[in-house]
Amino acid sequence: MASPIHATDDSATFQETDVISGNLLSNDSSDNGHLFLRAFDGASVGAKSGNSQVTEIQGDYGTFFVKPDGSYTYVLSDAAKIGFANGESFQEKVSYKISDGSGHTDVGLFTLNIQGVTQVKPIAVDDHYSFNEGDAIGGNVLDNDIAGDNGHLFLRQFDGTNVSAKSGPDAVTDIVGDYGVFHVKPNGEFTYELTDDLAAGQTVTETVQYYKISDGEGHTDAGVLTLNITGTDALV
């Protein structure tokens, strides 16, 4: 008797400068038409907040960000980016479990190949900031990044949204986060407007799963921005 659910193994190949993403469920099937990603590399994929909830899972050379709907992004670690030799390839192999929501499950294998590229490219180094509520929250995601051959760095995407540069380096793009709004510029500068009212001592974390930088000549890289904000007693 045929299984009511089937996971087909996945394989994807990207260059190290690509924004690495995809969906593991796109080639899978179930009799009832429902598919959910339940486990990835032995770790449960959280779904309490629905299909948009992100689970962060460490791989051998970077970090996977996966959702119950099967979508994923992958960000190379800084060590892997710097250690890539010309033409070298890294490979991540991960098992994953899917479900139809009715008790039927199956397991697939995901093989991710990442290829080194020849040009000297910009390298995006992950950013971590911590602020207290009431502080002027902001920074520049390009400050710790490494320029390529031409010495230029531009912010092109932020959390999946294109960063406008039509009005020059001071053009501002507004991007809504989980707890507030980012105001970002092509030169990497950002400010953050907290819209939630935090309790004293409460800490929330905004994670921008990737931002994409460019040298203006087609060479790109992606980094992660983590922003921690701690509530203060506004009545003091």
Swiss-Prot record:
Q: Which domain of life is it from?
A: Bacteria
Q: Annotated Gene Ontology MF terms?
A: metal ion binding
Q: Which UniProt keywords apply?
A: Calcium, Metal-binding, Plasmid, Secreted
Q: Does the keyword Secreted apply?
A: yes
One GO cellular component this record assigns the protein to is:
extracellular region
**Role played:** Interacts specifically in a calcium-dependent manner with the acidic exopolysaccharide (EPS) and capsular polysaccharide produced by R.leguminosarum. Could be involved in the development of the biofilm matrix made of EPS.
What NCBIfam families does this protein's entry cite? VCBS_repeat
What note about domains is in the entry? Contains two Ra/cadherin-like domains composed mostly of beta-sheets joined by a linker region. Proper folding and stability are dependent on the binding of one calcium ion per protein molecule.
Q: What is this protein called?
A: Calcium-binding lectin RapA2
What gene does the UniProt entry assign to this protein?
Answer: rapA2
